[in-house]
Amino acid sequence: MTVNLHDSAYDLEQALRQSEEYSRLKNLYDEVNGDPSAKKMFDNFRDIQLNLQQKQMNGEDITQEEVEQAQKSVALVQQHEKISQLMEAEQRMSMLIADLNKIIMKPLEELYGNPES
């Protein structure tokens, strides 16, 4: 029996969309985006985060001022209940996807060996 991996991937996509983790993430995301003040705060946090990630990927130095700005932004969004809940839901979704990736990569790790072991 031949398995169509793309069909399996689309099934996994649908399962992810129907999961409790995704539902909670989407609801919290919609709530944050429905509140103009929270949306502005969250967008600012994301912009700072993406800017720092881009600099790291480009091998650029991150200034102390940028580090302090990022720390202030994190402290600010963590004080906002809905944004804090959204960030927790994002973390749970990220861990779920990492677990799924481990499962998907298992045949290749078995074939080639796991370099981390």
Curated annotation (Swiss-Prot):
Domain of life according to the entry: Bacteria
One protein family per Pfam: Com_YlbF
Family label: Belongs to the UPF0342 family.
Protein name as catalogued: UPF0342 protein BLi01058/BL02870
Organism: Bacillus licheniformis (strain ATCC 14580 / DSM 13 / JCM 2505 / CCUG 7422 / NBRC 12200 / NCIMB 9375 / NCTC 10341 / NRRL NRS-1264 / Gibson 46)
